[in-house]
C-alpha cells in the first residue's frame, strides 16, 4: 500500500486544534520568525496523501534558527481561525519590528515621567565636603556664606529638597570640623549677617580636577613655607638644620675607630626610614671585613647553626695532609677563602637543604675543580 491516510492512524488530539493548513500556533509564529522547519512538516502545497518516498528524503530532522532557505508560511488571519483565538493576534506581527527602538512616548507607562523626578530619588555620589568645595569653586569671589551654600546644594541637587534639616546640619559640621574650610569675617561695609567661608589653598589637591573626589591629605602640602618636616628622616638633605648637624657630629665622634673606607661604603641618606634601614643592613652584610664573623643568613634554624659551629671548630683544627701531591696548604687556604662565607664546599654539602635560598650556587653548592680530596 503506497499511500495511507494520516488521519486514520493519528491519535485524537486534546485541546483546541489549529486549522490544517500547515500553520504553527500564533505564539510560535510571532517569536520565531525565521525557524528552519524540516521537510516532513505539512504545508498548504502538500496533498492530503503522501508517498512513503517523501518521508525518506528528509533534509534535516532538526529545527534550525535563522534558516537561509526555508521559511515558515506566513500567518494569515481571517475566517479560518478558530473561534477561541482573538482577532488581535493578527496585528502582533506588524508591531514587533517597531519595538527595537522605544521613543519617549513609549515610556509613558513608567511612574517616573521626567529626569528631575529621577534625580530626586538618587543620592549624589559626593560627600558633604565635596559639595561645599563645589559651591565655593562656583562662586565668583571663591567665598560663600552658609545660606548661599545651602542654596547652591538645593538648586543643583534635587535629592536634598526632601529633608533639609538633616543635610544642612551635616554641612555645618563639615564647615566647622574640616580644616580645609576657613572662615572669613565680613567687611564692615558689606551688609548682611554671617561670615564667609572659603577654601584653603593647601587643600585644593584633596579634590581632582572637576571630579571632587576625596583624597588623603598629605602633610607636605599642609606644612608652612613649603618645608617637608614629618615625612622625611633626620638624615635627608632636604631637612638640614643645626640640630641635625650637631647630631651628625656626635655620631662621628662616638666612633673614632671607624675606617674611612666604611664611610665611603655607607649608602647615601634615603627618603624613607624603612629603605634606609634596609640599605644599611644589606651594606653591612655584603661589605663586612671578616667573613667568618658574619651572622647566619635568615631562614636558618638554631640546629643547623649549632652544627655549623661544631664543624667550624673541626675545620679550624684540621691540618691538611702534606704527603698528598695534588693538594697543599696553600690549596686548602685558597679553598676556604674562595667560599663567600669563609667555609669550604665540603662543609656546606651537609647543609645544602638549608642554603638553597641564601647561598650563591656557583661558589658553594657545587665543588670547584681541584678541591676534592
Curated annotation (Swiss-Prot):
This is Forkhead box protein I1-ema. It is found in: Nucleus. One of its GO terms (molecular function) is DNA-binding transcription factor activity. InterPro entries: Fork_head_dom, FOX_domain-containing, TF_fork_head_CS_1, TF_fork_head_CS_2, WH-like_DNA-bd_sf, WH_DNA-bd_sf. Residues 123-217 bind DNA. Its main location: nucleus. Keywords: Activator, Developmental protein, DNA-binding, Nucleus, Transcription, Transcription regulation. The keyword Isomerase does not apply. It comes from the Eukaryota. It comes from Xenopus tropicalis. Transcriptional activator. Activates ectoderm, in addition to inhibiting mesoderm and endoderm formation; required at the blastula stage for normal formation of both the central nervous system and epidermis, the two early derivatives of the ectoderm. In addition, also required to maintain the regional identity of the animal cells of the blastula, the cells that are precursors of ectodermal structures. Also plays a role in differential adhesion, which limits cell mixing as primary germ layers become specified. Pfam families: Forkhead (PF00250). One of its GO terms (cellular component) is nucleus. Residues 1-23, 208-274 are annotated as: Disordered. GO terms for biological process: negative regulation of endodermal cell fate specification; negative regulation of mesodermal cell fate determination; positive regulation of DNA-templated transcription. CDD domains: FH_FOXI1 (cd20053).
